[in-house]
């Protein structure tokens, strides 16, 4: 994560100096989506079966039924599936990899 932070700062510095950080932006998108997916998967696995149920009503005001597992475990499965699509929207990771390759090989 520290490496991602430093890379982000480099991209910002590059943009501020007038250089378009095309390759840096693509690499940040790829790596950021992979990190988010892996951390959500790890968290889901660490919580175990209690991360599986998602009852949206439990987050509504006035919900007074017992939740399945700890309160923080409820949205984990939903978050996991939301983070799976990060590599697709905003330009799929495959497209971003093509941008990096073209930038690197000056195509």
Residue ranges and their predicted role:
Residues 1-107:
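Alpha-helical interface subdomain recognition
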